[in-house]
Structures are given as structure tokens and as C-alpha cells.
């Protein structure tokens, strides 16, 4: 893979920073009404590219493919609300965190059984494949269905096909602002 200095020189020589993100996780990275990629991670990565004197080029990918693409050299960086874990830190370099996410548990309004993470034992959730949300749900005894987007998760929850889901509190709040029903 080369040293960090070699990678930086290659990025600057190419004139572009290839940034991987999901593009489907509001408010972090998503498409607005005009189908323009926007969001907090988009703004952060634009600022990084500007500081490097290059243009950002975005590649949208499912969560479970982000690290594989980085490993294969298809991307220069992932800018997608990645939680720093001991296991990931063995392989990847991280910036100082630019955002902190609190994990929230969401259930249907008519669900009185699940109030805490401990109540997930024996229940079904849906979460992004290979995410820390998936790992957390499994650690509390939930059966987890792997999916690609928060939108899909909410649809499964609304249809009663899962009992609960875990995700960033800010993502749930943002979703509820856009979809108050």
C-alpha cells in the first residue's frame, strides 16, 4: 500500500481524492431533492480535499463494501460515520473523530415489549451488514437481518417484519423530521 507520504503524493499528483460513502444515510450522506449528493460527511470530505488541493470524487457503496474497497485500493478514504474500534484500528488509520453518534433503539409505537437493549433477547432486528449496530444487537441476543440502508430498515419495522432496529439517534431524528408519520 505504501507509506502515508507516498499515498498523499499519489493523491495530489492525480488531482483527486476518491472518497467512499454510503450516500443513503441522512444526514451524513444522501441525495437531496435534485439528486445531488449532500450531507455532513460530504462537507467534511470536501474540506479535506480542498486542504489537499485536490477535487473530491465520490463513490457510493453499501456499508459492508466500504472497507473491502479501501483494502483493494478503489478508494483513498472512507468518510461515512465509521466507529473507531480496536479491531479496525489494527488495520486502518483514523482522524480525530469529527462527530459522535449515540446509538438509539427504535421500535413501532405499538411495541410495549422493547424498552432497553436487554429486551432485544429473542427479538428480530435489521441493521447494516458488518456494522457496530449489528454487533450490538447480536450481543444482546437479537437475531439480526442484514440490510443495506436505514430506509429499508424503517420499512421493515413499519411493516412489522422486524421487532426493532438500532442506528444513530441523529439519523432517526432526521428521518422523523422528513417522515413524521
Show the residue positions of the predicted features.
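A ligand-binding cleft/hinge motif common to bilobed small-molecule-binding domains
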Residues: 65, 82-91, 136-139, 163-181
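Ligand-binding cleft/hinge of the Venus flytrap
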Residues: 29-34, 45-54, 117, 130-149, ...
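Short secondary-structure boundary segments
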Residues: 23, 82-83, 109, 129, ...
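Flexible hinge/capping segments at coil-to-helix
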Residues: 108-124
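Short helix-initiation/N-cap motifs at beta->coil->alpha
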Residues: 58-68, 112, 130-131, 145-159
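Alpha-to-beta junction loops
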Residues: 17-18, 53-55, 71-80, 123-124, ...
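Short Pro/Gly-enriched coil loops immediately N-terminal to beta-strands
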Residues: 92-104, 149
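Extracytoplasmic small-molecule ligand-binding "clamshell" domains
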Residues: 2-81
Amino acid at each position: 500500500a505504501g507509506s502515508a507520504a507516498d499515498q498523499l503524493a499519489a493523491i495530489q499528483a492525480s488531482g483527486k481524492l476518491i472518497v467512499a460513502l454510503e450516500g443513503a444515510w441522512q444526514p451524513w450522506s444522501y441525495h437531496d431533492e435534485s439528486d445531488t449528493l449532500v450531507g455532513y460527511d460530504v462537507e467534511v470530505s470536501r474540506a479535506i480535499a480542498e486542504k489537499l488541493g485536490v477535487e473530491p470524487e465520490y463513490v457510493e457503496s453499501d456499508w459492508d463494501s466500504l472497507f473491502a474497497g479501501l483494502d483493494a485500493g478503489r478508494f483513498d478514504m472512507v468518510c461515512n460515520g465509521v466507529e473507531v474500534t480496536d479491531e479496525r484500528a489494527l488495520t486502518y488509520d483514523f482522524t480525530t473523530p469529527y462527530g459522535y453518534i449515540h446509538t438509539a433503539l427504535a421500535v413501532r409505537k405499538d411495541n410495549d415489549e422493547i424498552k432497553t437493549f436487554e429486551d432485544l433477547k429473542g427479538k428480530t432486528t435489521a441493521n447494516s451488514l458488518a456494522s457496530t449496530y449489528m454487533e450490538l444487537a447480536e450481543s444482546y441476543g437479537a437475531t439480526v437481518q442484514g440490510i443495506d440502508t436505514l430506509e429499508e430498515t424503517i420499512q421493515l419495522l413499519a411493516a412489522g417484519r422486524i421487532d426493532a432496529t438500532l442506528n444513530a439517534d441523529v439519523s432517526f431524528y432526521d428521518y422523523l423530521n422528513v417522515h413524521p408519520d
